[in-house]
Amino acid sequence: MTDLALEEVASTDEGVEVSVRGEIDVASASQLRDFLDRLLDAGSSRIVLDCRKLEFLDSSGIGVLVAARNRLGDAGEIILDSPQPQVRKVLDITGVSSRLSVVP
C-alpha cells in the first residue's frame, strides 16, 4: 500500500489545482473526501486533480469523486488530469469518465 498525498499547488478565484500522489482506496478515501469537502466549503467551483502520480483508484475513491461532483452540480467541475493508464481504465470501465472531465 502506498500512502495518499494531496497538495494544493495552485489557486485562483474559480478553483484549485491539486497534486494527487499514491493510492486512493478504502483506507485513504476519507482523506480525499475531507480534502475535497474543505475545497468545496471554501467555494471552489473548479477542481483540477493532477493524477500523473496516482497509482491506484478503487470504488471507494470513485464514490468520493462522484459525490464531490454531485455536490458541485451544474455550477462547477472536477477535472482528472493525466491519469495513468491503469487509473484511466478503471474510470472508463466504471463509466465515471462520462461524469467527470478526464483530460488526456
Please state what every model-predicted region is.
Residues 1-19:
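Short beta-strand/loop segment at the start of cytosolic alpha/beta domains
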Residues 23-99:
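Amphipathic alpha-helical interaction surfaces in cytosolic regulatory modules
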Residues 101-104:
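Short acidic-hydrophobic, aromatic-tinged amphipathic segments that line or gate anion-handling sites
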